[in-house]
Amino acid sequence: LMPDEYEYKDKIVGNYGPYIQSERIEIYHAYIKRLIEIGRAYPCFCKKETLEELRKNQEEKKMRTGYYGRFAKCRSISIEEAITRIKNGESYVIRFKSEGDFNNKIIFEDLSKGKLSLSENDIDDVIMKSDTMLPTYHFAHVVDDHLMHTTHVVRGEEWLPSVTKHIEMFRALGLKPVSYTHLRAHETSLHL
């Protein structure tokens, strides 16, 4: 099986490059800017220790763990404060502001598993851009698959819980979600 789009060594094949994420940063930033403008993304300045403490407190109280709702402290930071903190060199990531409700379902057709119904994502304002300026898999998947006209994604079933995050991001950007197929790896520890 030969891909119809790729970059390998000195050979570039396809119409939708560049194919290396670090060469697509301006593209990702344009989409992030749009999400910030419509109130669906925000900078988060929480340190690793703060997030670990949050998780520990949620576990102790037998709550669902995650950076969401009232626990997402940076959701309410004003644009002015965020700009000041960024200009002062404070480290940050960009998070997607999920509007999911656990009681609502996202229904979609998985091409190998059939019609599936999963609760909307309401416990994770997923990181879209790391503090290194590169996008995370979740965000790159949505942007790249749209721009590269990907219609079908085949991946391991360990990614099934992420479908709700991805579909919500596609919809927030006004993009058509791809079709998914989630396959179980054989009895090995290989990941698809």
Residue positions per predicted region:
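Active-site cores that bind ATP or allylic diphosphates and position pyrophosphate for catalysis
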Residues: Q21, R34-Y180, R184, S189
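A conserved beta-strand/loop capping segment in the N-terminal third of enzymes
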Residues: D10-V13, I27-Y28, I32
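Short amphipathic alpha-helical segments at helix-loop
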Residues: V13-Y16, T151
